[in-house]
């Protein structure tokens, strides 16, 4: 794990890792030293046993229901206001194996700007090959992770959502290329 800067354990953040594997959530929980919750799709809450823990540690969103998505957005804002950090995968899901990095959704960046919470991009280049969605096609090895320095928002205006999205995307994209991406 490479840290670009020391994390203030008393601070709270929105972490934005690239999403490449079904094991990304437990992996992020293992590496980050701060209490946090995830925002994730409602389908995962239906998985036996894992779903129980997921429901208690995530803001669940039904992405097909705009009203539910907005309610989840508000709930995530309340979690941040209470001092918890959030982890949001800006790709909105695990991309297909042949996709290098999916276009990011604006939700994490809108939330960060509305709450004036710093964003920390995280690059995970190896989980896709070591822990693919096809469970028996994985392999052992060393997993690299880079936790980038926080992007300080300093009361950015809402019109900056796209710029923030692009900045985080470029940080992760460039780091994936540095690691030898496709």
Give the positions of each predicted feature.
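Generic detector of short, locally flexible boundary/turn motifs and exposed helical patches
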Residues: 2-6, 24-28, 50-55, 84-87, ...
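Proline- and acidic/polar-enriched loop/turn elements at helix boundaries
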Residues: 4-6, 43, 66, 91, ...
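A generic secondary-structure micro-motif detector
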Residues: 2, 39-40, 66, 97-99
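Catalytic core of membrane glycerolipid acyltransferases/transacylases, capturing the structured
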Residues: 9-66
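Generic preference for hydrophobic
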Residues: 1, 15, 38, 145-147
């Amino acid at each position: 794990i490479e840290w670009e800067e020391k994390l203030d354990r008393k601070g709270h953040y929105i972490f934005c890792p690239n999403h490449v594997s079904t094991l990304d959530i437990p992996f992020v929980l293992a590496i980050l030293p701060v209490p946090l919750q995830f925002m994730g799709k409602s389908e995962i809450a239906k998985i036996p046993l894992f779903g129980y823990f997921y429901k208690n540690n995530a803001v669940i969103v039904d992405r097909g229901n705009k009203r539910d998505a907005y309610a989840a957005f508000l709930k995530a804002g309340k979690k941040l206001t209470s001092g918890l950090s959030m982890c949001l995968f800006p790709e909105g899901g695990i991309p297909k194996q042949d996709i290098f990095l999916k276009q990011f959704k604006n939700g994490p960046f809108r939330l960060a700007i509305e709450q004036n919470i710093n964003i920390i991009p995280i690059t995970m280049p190896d989980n896709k090959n070591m822990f693919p969605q096809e469970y028996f096609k994985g392999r052992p090895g060393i997993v690299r992770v880079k936790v980038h320095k926080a992007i300080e928002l300093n009361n950015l205006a809402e019109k900056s959502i796209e710029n923030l999205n692009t900045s985080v995307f470029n940080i992760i994209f460039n780091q994936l290329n540095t690691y030898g991406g496709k």
